[in-house]
Regions:
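N-terminal secretory signal peptides that target proteins for export/translocation
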Residues: 1-5
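Sec/Tat signal peptide C-region and signal peptidase I cleavage site
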Residues: 22-29
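Predominant activation on well-ordered alpha-helical scaffold segments within soluble catalytic domains
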Residues: 48, 97, 151, 197, ...
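Pocket-lining segment of extracytoplasmic ligand-binding domains
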Residues: 95, 162-169, 174-271
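Secondary-structure end/capping motifs
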Residues: 230-319
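Conserved C-terminal helix/tail region of periplasmic/extracytoplasmic solute-binding proteins
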Residues: 307-359
Length: 359
C-alpha cells in the first residue's frame, strides 16, 4: 500500500512520540541514583517537602540523575551512612566527626543548613538542677549532640567536676517522648524539638538549659561520602541537591504555605508547632549566609570545642591517642589535626556556586 505524504507525516509524528517518550525513560532507568538519609528535625524536615513538591525531581532531572530521600531514626541514619548503605545524610557537626569520620569514612559537609538556637534542651522533673543531676538517670541518644549539650550545660554551670557521675540512659529518638512521659520516675531527658515541645506539655517538666546558650556549636549539615563527591556523577549530585535545598528553604523562609505545611507534616507536627521550632533554628536561608559561616574563623573555633569533646569521651575510635588523629579540613585549606589523617571536610564550593547562580 502506498503511503501518502499526509499519512507518512502522521506516521513520523507517531514514531517521534513513541521514541521521544521511551528513550528518556530508558536513559533514566540507567541514571545514577543517590540516596539521602534524613531524620525528624526542624532543619531537616524540608527534605520531605523538597520531595513532595517536585523541587528535588526538577533539580535531579536537570543533572540527569535520580535522588531519593529516605527518613530514618537519627542513630540509624548515621549507621547507614557509615555502612555506605546511603550516599549522603543529614547530621550534626559533632556526629559527622564521631561517627563516619571516626569510623574511617572520609566525609564532606557540602551544606551548612542551620545551627540550633534553642532547639536542643535539657529537661528535668522535680526541680532538679545541674548540681543535683549527677547520679540520676538521664535519657538521651548517646554519642550525639544531646550528650555534648548536657556536658556543656554542666561545665557552664560550674559542675565540670561532677561529669563522671552522670548516669546516661541511651534511648532512641523515636521512643524517648513516650518512655519519659509514661514513667514519672524518669527525671531528666536531653533531646531536640519537636520532641522537646512534646515533653514540655507535662507541667511537671521544666527546661534548665538549651542550645541558645552555645550558638553555632550544634550545626546541622548535609554530609556526603568524599569518595562519591570525587566522581563526576557525585559532583552532579552535589549540585542538584544543593540547588534543590536552597530553592526549598527560600520558600520556607518566605512563609510559603505548602513549604511550611509539608515540613510540619514530616514530623506529624502542626503548622503552629513547626513555626515555633523554626524560631529556635538559626536557618542559613541563603547560600551566602551559609557560605560566609562555612568560611569564617568561627567555624574552626566551634569545631575545636567539638573535637576536643569527642576525644575526651573516646568518640573518635579505638586506638586514637590524640585529638589530632581524626583531622578536619576547611575551605581555606586550614587543617585541624594531622594533615595525613583528614576524615571530615567542609566544602563551601557548592554553597558558593548557589550564591553565584552557577548551579
Amino acid at each position: 500500500m502506498k503511503v501518502t505524504k499526509p499519512r507518512f507525516f502522521s506516521l513520523i509524528c507517531a514514531l517521534c512520540l513513541v521514541f521521544g517518550t521511551v528513550v528518556p525513560l530508558a536513559a533514566r532507568a540507567d541514571a545514577p541514583t543517590f540516596t539521602v538519609g534524613w531524620s525528624v528535625y526542624a532543619g531537616w524536615n524540608p527534605y520531605f517537602y523538597m520531595q513532595k513538591s517536585g523541587i528535588l525531581k526538577k533539580w535531579a532531572d536537570k543533572y540527569g540523575i535520580v535522588i531519593k530521600v529516605q527518613r530514618f531514626d537519627y542513630a540509624t541514619s548515621l549507621d547507614s551512612f557509615v555502612a555506605k548503605s546511603i550516599d549522603a545524610c543529614t547530621m550534626t557537626n559533632m556526629d559527622a566527626l564521631d561517627m563516619p569520620a571516626a569510623a574511617g569514612v572520609d566525609s564532606t559537609a557540602i551544606i551548612v543548613g542551620d545551627y540550633s538556637n534553642g532547639n536542643d534542651a535539657v529537661l528535668v522533673r522535680n526541680g532538679l538542677s545541674f548540681g543535683t543531676l549527677p547520679g540520676k538517670p538521664i535519657m538521651l541518644v548517646q554519642k550525639t549532640v544531646s550528650e555534648y549539650l548536657l556536658e556543656r550545660g554542666m561545665v557552664l554551670n560550674g559542675q565540670q567536676a561532677q561529669l563522671s557521675k552522670l548516669r546516661l540512659i541511651n534511648t532512641s529518638d523515636s521512643d524517648i517522648v513516650a518512655a519519659f512521659l509514661n514513667n514519672k520516675s524518669n527525671q531528666a531527658v536531653v533531646t531536640w524539638k519537636p520532641l522537646v515541645s512534646q515533653i514540655a506539655t507535662d507541667k511537671s517538666v521544666h527546661e534548665i538549659f538549651d542550645s541558645s546558650k552555645i550558638p553555632g556549636e550544634i550545626l546541622d549539615l548535609l554530609v556526603v561520602r568524599t569518595d562519591i563527591l570525587n566522581t563526576p556523577d557525585g559532583q552532579r549530585f552535589a549540585k542538584a541537591i544543593t540547588g534543590a535545598w536552597y530553592e526549598t528553604v527560600a520558600q520556607l523562609a518566605a512563609g510559603q504555605p505548602n513549604a511550611i505545611k509539608y515540613s510540619a507534616a514530616a514530623s506529624d507536627d502542626t503548622v503552629d508547632s513547626y513555626k515555633e521550632q523554626l524560631k529556635t533554628t538559626a536557618l542559613f536561608s541563603t547560600p551566602k549566609a551559609a557560605a560566609d559561616f562555612a568560611t569564617s574563623p568561627a567555624l574552626q573555633q566551634k569545631m575545636d570545642l567539638v573535637r576536643k569533646f569527642c576525644f575526651t569521651h573516646g568518640l573518635l575510635g579505638q586506638g586514637v591517642k590524640s585529638v589530632d588523629d581524626v583531622a578536619i579540613a576547611y575551605p581555606n585549606g586550614a587543617v585541624q589535626g594531622d594533615k595525613g589523617r583528614v576524615r571530615l571536610r567542609f566544602n563551601a564550593a557548592y554553597m558558593q556556586a548557589a550564591q553565584q547562580g552557577k548551579l
